[in-house]
Curated annotation (Swiss-Prot):
The gene is nadD. InterPro entries: Cyt_trans-like, NadD/NMNAT, Rossmann-like_a/b/a_fold. It comes from the Bacteria. The lineage of its organism: Bacteria, Bacillati, Bacillota, Clostridia, Eubacteriales. CDD domains: NMNAT. It comes from Clostridium botulinum (strain Alaska E43 / Type E3). This is Probable nicotinate-nucleotide adenylyltransferase.
Length: 200
């Protein structure tokens, strides 16, 4: 059976933190493939300014081209209407594939607020990486609560802490600060060519 990891996000822009998480998940969980899933029309971002799906797709594609086992899917950006995680997992799930949904600690804390969270937990193995804002104690408590309630096993990734966020990168670009230590060079070129994030 193939083992596929799915890492979703707006990737606005993608940065080294995303690539590091994907690389470590692939290595630690012996995954055959990591599928990057740029969000199309995420319900939790409604009303917020988001870079076009086409450009976000190009940024991800340029970032992952030199990584073995990294791929990208257009499923969510080509889907009409809102993009719900459980629908994405249903699309990729089959008898020959075991899915690993890779997400941040904030998702674990709010998982029961997600659309059809029970389906997310039944269709995939939830793989969680730590993010600022939550203590280990809070994370473990929520992990044990969800595992007991839904009869699932949640995987916590062991990662070195990288404090990089797309929000911070956009703010730095707006303030004409350097971001080349956060973002791959081809992405900086795409950002500059398309005049992105000058006004947030």
């Amino acid at each position: 059976m193939k083992r596929y990891g799915i890492i979703g996000g707006t990737f606005d822009p993608i940065h080294y933190g995303h690539l590091y998480i994907a690389y470590e998940a692939k290595k630690q969980l012996s995954l055959d493939k990591i599928i990057f899933m740029p969000a199309g029309n995420p319900p939790h971002k409604e009303g917020k300014k988001i870079t076009s799906a086409k450009l976000r797709y190009e940024m991800v594609k340029s970032s992952i081209k030199d990584f073995s086992g990294f791929s990208i899917s257009k499923y969510e950006i080509e889907k009409k209407g809102f993009s719900y995680t459980y629908e994405t997992l249903e699309h990729f799930k089959n008898n020959d594939v075991e899915l690993f949904f890779i997400t941040g600690a904030d998702c674990l804390m709010d998982i029961e607020k997600w659309e059809s969270s029970d389906k997310i937990l039944s269709l995939s193995n939830l793989v969680v990486f730590s993010r600022g804002g939550f203590s280990n104690k809070e994370l473990i408590k929520q992990k044990e609560y969800i595992e007991k309630k839904y009869h699932v096993s949640i995987i916590l990734l062991t990662l070195k802490r990288l404090e990089i966020s797309s929000t911070d990168i956009r703010e730095r670009i707006k303030n004409k600060e350097r971001v080349d230590f956060f973002v791959p060079q081809p992405i900086i070129k795409l950002i500059e060519e398309n005049n992105l994030y000058k006004e947030e």
